[in-house]
Amino acid sequence: MDAKDLYDLILSTYPSVTEGAICDLHKPCSKHRECSIKLSNKYIDFDAVETEFDRGRVSRPSVDAVKNAGQYFCFIEIKGWKKYLEWNTPSEKGIQEQAEYDLKGKLETSEEICVAISGQHNIFRQIPEVFILVTDIDVSEQGVENFHFNMMALATTSSVWESKCNTELNSQLEQQITTIPKYYVTCKQLENKLNVISRV
């Protein structure tokens, strides 16, 4: 079994679960598109897979989406910051709290579900995995080393807060996902990243 076989098996096991663009799986974007970028790739809504898999049991946090890319099986988690920054008065503490995602737990639950669906306990010894954390803000902003200086100089600019959001979330990614390759990208960069991964 390869990554595409696993992807297709998930779809055939749960025919009520559909594929969609990454924008459709991000709740703020699914209701009102914030950008004009048209992304063509389709992803399995893995939250819907978890709901079906755990029906009648306590629901567990899982990744938002999965996708095959060449030999790799990609677990994808979406974390939007734009609406949070628009609707709230940003603070260091607030951003730290928002960034405290159980990424490791989401990955482990999702792996367990894939193992059960495949019927192969060692499926991820056969299929290499990748974890991709996707956000809706620019990930090229400067890190926390410039945060305090920027706060004094540019206290009202959103890019300063985006920098803090990126630093906190990337820190969570680095600390929690330690056994497989991981990437932190914007939604606009996702398809290009998948193309790169598929050529490895």
Q: Which ranges hold each PLM region?
A:
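Basic, amphipathic N-terminal segments that precede the first structured/catalytic domain
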Residues: M1-R60, K193-V200
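Short, flexible loop/turn elements at secondary-structure junctions
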Residues: C29, N41-Y43, E50, A69, ...
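Catalytic micro-motifs at enzyme active sites that drive phosphoryl/nucleotidyl and oxygen chemistry
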Residues: F53-R55, V63-D64, S118-N122
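Conserved catalytic cores of phosphodiester-cleaving nucleases, focusing on short active-site segments
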Residues: A65-K67, Y72-G80, S110
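Catalytic cores of nucleic-acid endonucleases
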Residues: W81-D138
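Short, low-complexity, polybasic intrinsically disordered segments
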Residues: R125, E129-V196
